[in-house]
């Protein structure tokens, strides 16, 4: 079983603290989004699966080092747990890959707004798989989420038309397909992981180790099948700048990998998605600061509508818990 080596008397309470897990998840989410955007925007970079392989490899190696020094314990790979967790690893790969493809073409603020749609899928998924209901206030927040996504796409198209008047900018553009696929994969990942954690009784380090260790052969296989491994393309993708960016990206993935599982375990999958909604405003602002994202009225308005929807959803969930 997974446990952090106890050096502080209240380490157990911290490990099970919902607020602490939420704060750590927010910080790692912001860092991961900004870092991944930097990596995929590196000139000539096109080996997404290799980037994801590097991230999973760094996570796995960090865990092995922690275990070597006695700071972490996790279950060794075994056939039963591998069979139970393999679908999660495939979903994780698809989730991060579609996220990287969407980030390649989408500004960070627009990307974060569309991620709100995942909350709707997760909420109704929880109704379907775990019972419960959706309150009128939750439904109102969902309408705001959809509205923010529509406004964001209009702002994105407006900015694109100014930059490239003859370009075909519509909701049917490839980046929106990648974004919608990412929402489906993300919701499936969170819902199924919650069920599998209960089934396997995994702890945080178990979840982190299995997520990344099982993803390694999957990512490498997809890379060999779909990416260009010619010497010219390798030289283009493994320049000094892209290598440094991938290493940094791998280091940030350690935090998001651990904090995602921690937050789902310490709270719930809906709370996890709700926190992600409230986290959209700082992520979107970070995108405006660090990248050349559209800065027009519609784009800015969509950010605040998205934040309002997340806030509304948070209040709705709190009232629902108090009522029950």
Curated annotation (Swiss-Prot):
InterPro entries: TPT_transporter. The chain crosses the membrane at residues 14-34, 45-65, 77-97, 117-137, 139-159, 171-191, 205-225, 244-264, 271-291, 296-316. Glycans are attached at residues 116, 168, 237. The keyword Mitochondrion does not apply. It comes from the Eukaryota. One of its GO terms (biological process) is protein N-linked glycosylation. Homooligomer. This is GDP-mannose transporter. It comes from Candida glabrata (strain ATCC 2001 / BCRC 20586 / JCM 3761 / NBRC 0622 / NRRL Y-65 / CBS 138).
């Amino acid at each position: 079983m997974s446990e952090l080596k106890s050096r502080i008397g209240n380490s157990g309470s911290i490990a099970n603290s919902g607020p602490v897990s939420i704060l750590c998840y927010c910080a790692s989410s912001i860092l991961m989004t900004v870092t991944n955007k930097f990596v995929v925007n590196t000139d000539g970079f096109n080996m997404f699966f290799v980037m994801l392989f590097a991230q999973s490899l760094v996570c796995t190696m960090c865990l092995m080092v922690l275990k070597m020094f006695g700071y972490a314990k996790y279950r060794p790979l075994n056939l039963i747990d591998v069979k139970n967790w393999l679908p999660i690893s495939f979903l994780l790969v698809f989730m991060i890959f579609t996220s990287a493809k969407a980030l390649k073409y989408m500004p960070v603020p627009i990307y974060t707004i569309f991620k709100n749609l995942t909350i709707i899928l997760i909420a109704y998924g929880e109704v379907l798989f775990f019972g419960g209901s959706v309150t009128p206030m939750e439904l109102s927040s969902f309408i705001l989420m959809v509205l923010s996504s529509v406004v964001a796409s209009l702002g994105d198209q407006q900015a694109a038309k100014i930059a490239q008047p003859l370009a075909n900018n519509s909701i049917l553009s490839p980046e929106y397909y990648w974004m919608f696929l990412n929402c489906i994969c993300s919701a499936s990942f969170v819902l199924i992981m919650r069920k599998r954690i209960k089934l396997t009784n995994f702890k945080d380090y178990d979840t982190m180790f299995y997520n990344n260790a099982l993803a390694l052969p999957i990512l490498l296989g997809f890379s060999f099948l779909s990416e260009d491994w010619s010497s010219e393309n390798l030289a283009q993708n493994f320049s000094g700048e892209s290598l440094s960016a991938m290493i940094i990206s791998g280091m940030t993935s350690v935090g998001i990998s651990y904090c995602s599982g921690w937050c789902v375990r310490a709270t719930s999958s809906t709370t996890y998605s709700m926190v992600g909604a409230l986290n959209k405003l700082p992520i979107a602002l970070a995108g405006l600061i660090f990248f050349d994202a559209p800065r027009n009225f519609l784009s800015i308005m969509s950010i605040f509508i998205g934040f309002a929807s997340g806030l509304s959803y948070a209040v709705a969930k709190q009232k629902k818990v108090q009522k029950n």
